[in-house]
Regions:
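A cross-family glycoside hydrolase active-site/sugar-binding cleft signature
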Residues: 1, 24-28, 93-95, 210-213, ...
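Short amphipathic alpha-helices and their capping/turn segments at secondary-structure boundaries
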Residues: 8-18, 77-84, 234-236, 264-272
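Amphipathic alpha-helical segments in well-structured domains
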Residues: 7-11, 73, 116, 120, ...
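Alpha-helix N-cap and loop-to-helix initiation/capping positions
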Residues: 2-6, 64-68, 183, 187, ...
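N-terminal substrate-binding region of glycoside hydrolase catalytic domains
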Residues: 1-70, 248
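Polysaccharide-binding and catalytic clefts of secreted carbohydrate-active enzymes
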Residues: 42-240, 244-253
Length: 304
């Protein structure tokens, strides 16, 4: 059973109905509004300086968020392990950002992020690691006045600029935007690794660790989603990661109806090459039984 855990009593309820139950528990690492009020520089921020008001969001680059909510995650794992049915838990899915699927909030609406002070500082640190010197950065960005301590996140206009269709040319000033998107993708995976390592440490590696992630197909339906989303480092960094057992995602929201193939968000079979699993979740909610049966048959056949 995949269960979005909000109360440990949920484990007991499922076991009462299914005495053989085993669980993948789903949790998230969203901060509280109070935490954001105490850490304003760590709050996820759009290009115009505004913050998200519909849900509390810390910058993925915030080290303080990683530390504080890593400890909350550690406490949750310990509580599960000490619960009477805790031995039935076999893994944990850790979610964050849009729908818990680790792509940046505002991606679907083309809202430019993350311009928070902590993200600017993290971007500069990433650039310093890549370029080492001001001269190397200036040459790559074709920007004679930029320095490692003063580099800024590209503006929305810079992020929209392309040279050939939707492609960017790394031999031009496009490199600034290329660097930023690589950085943003790296930060997501760095954060994921931080939280996974806590789970593996507390469970001595007994639990599977996974995320909704790796949407190489689904986030490529529009070029801006591929860039803004932050998933595109998964082939470079998630494949073969020793702390990532599985990735997950719903079936594609294209071609998922009766008689349609139910395609994947990700490069599904690539994960198997690295001895990793991919969990396909069907979040279709048909109202008619024949449709439900047809979709179940299609999904089962697709996995064979």
């Amino acid at each position: 059973h995949m269960i979005a855990l909000t109360d440990l009593a949920q484990l007991d309820e499922v076991v009462a109905a299914d005495p053989q139950a085993r669980f993948l528990v789903q949790t998230s690492v969203f901060p509280s509004w109070d935490w954001l009020a105490a850490h304003p520089d760590d709050q996820f921020r759009y290009a115009d300086g505004s913050v998200e008001t519909s849900i509390p969001l810390a910058s993925v680059s915030s080290r303080q968020w990683r530390v504080d909510y890593g400890e909350q995650l550690r406490n949750l794992v310990r509580n599960i392990l000490s619960h009477s049915n805790g031995d039935r838990v076999v893994g944990m899915l850790i979610g964050y950002m849009t729908s818990g699927e680790w792509f940046y909030w505002g991606t679907n609406e083309r809202k430019y992020s993350d311009y928070s002070p902590v993200n600017v500082a993290a971007f500069r640190a990433w650039l310093a690691h890549k370029y080492s010197t001001d001269a190397a950065l200036q040459a790559a960005w074709h920007e004679p006045s930029v320095t490692l301590p003063t580099a800024q996140i590209p503006t929305p206009a810079e992020r929209d600029a392309t040279h050939a269709f939707d492609l960017r040319d790394p031999s031009t000033s496009d490199q600034k935007t290329i660097d930023y998107y690589r950085f943003m993708a790296d930060e997501i995976i760095d954060a994921q690794e931080h939280f996974r390592e806590i789970v593996r440490e507390e469970t001595a590696g007994r639990w599977l660790t996974l995320h909704y992630f790796g949407y190489g197909y689904e986030l490529s339906d529009y070029p801006f989603r591929a860039n803004y989303g932050g998933h595109m480092a998964y082939a470079r960094r998630s494949f073969g990661s020793p702390t990532l057992d599985m990735a997950a995602g719903p079936y594609s929201y294209y071609w998922r109806g009766p008689g349609q193939p139910g395609t994947s968000h990700t490069t599904q079979h690539s994960w198997a090459l690295y001895n990793q699993l991919y969990w396909h979740e069907d979040d279709t909610r048909p109202t008619e039984l024949p449709t439900l049966i047809q979709l179940a048959r299609r999904n089962a056949a697709r996995q064979l």
